[in-house]
């Protein structure tokens, strides 16, 4: 599957050309159009590609018009055999929904159910659903609520899981593992994506690990577990550093999220490159435990970062910029800082952030305080300094 950003109606013609050239070469990988802020683009793309992703929060500004346009989209999908992903993000909930339910997991569930009910009314079931958030608690609760309601109404659409804007490095992997594994362990979810602000291929090993683990092809390397009330002591014998990190996250992320445990002590060994057995020392154990507690929203020892993986709308080096922002803000414990690839989705999808760095394109950046842009058209070369200046102001 290849997903392509489609920001304007003109790009729909490019989609058709891309598809034609691929098919001429005997490449039949399905194409997915990722569409935001335009129901007309979604309708046009549905006649070309195998799947269209829409976001209910920005499909159309007017709710009644959105329902009319969605009915048109469904008909085009039916005629062309096109699948549909209803992909809601926590940060882009519409004002009508948040006025009714707040900015909550319940609001996410209710928003998606409105659209699924329209699918049911139109006898259209070629649909997959996602309810992503950068907050693992919000993400897991939203999926649980939706899964429960779909069971109650007797219509279970497949769920695509992911923690959006998870960031990079160990933190991004741990956060993704915590959210996704909590749901997979409950039998919720059919497909997954691990979203990292890194080269895209780095997402695959983590996603493959999760798929293998919850399809019973892979098991934890934990060799012993001691429980004393809400404190757990776990000992591992892992074949690699990353395997230890992922096993630890999956074994205890859900229990921490659901407050079954309050503390985890990590011990054991892992194998470094060169087959050298390495003892998990107290410093590394504390680091992984801190990262896990932060990912599970139980204790914050550093800033919380929100960073998208980038897409066709990103016009700057997102990963390197994010790494610099992390380095220069590492002392701001508990603050939520977002680094987003584009002005199209960035402001909405970083709704939880205290501060945001959002690419505009053409070498310019917008800086946000909460949901409000406080500086626009800042040259990239100055933007991080400006962000830090603003943060330091009383």
Regions found by a protein language model. Name each.
Residues 1, 48-63, 186-200, 260-278, ...:
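Glycine-rich phosphate-binding active-site loops on the catalytic face of alpha/beta enzymes
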Residues 362-365, 372-393:
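Beta-strand/loop-dominated core regions that host nucleotide or nucleotide-derived cofactor-binding catalytic loops
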Residues 1-115:
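Active-site beta->alpha loop and helix N-cap motifs at the rims of alpha/beta catalytic domains
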Residues 48, 229-230, 353-355:
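Active-site-proximal glycine-rich helix-loop-beta segment
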Residues 331, 354-355, 364-367:
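Catalytic-core signal marking the mid-to-C-terminal active-site face
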Residues 344-349:
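Acidic, divalent-metal-coordinating active-site segment for phosphoryl/phosphodiester hydrolysis
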Residues 89, 96-332, 336-339:
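Catalytic alpha/beta core domains of metabolic enzymes, predominantly
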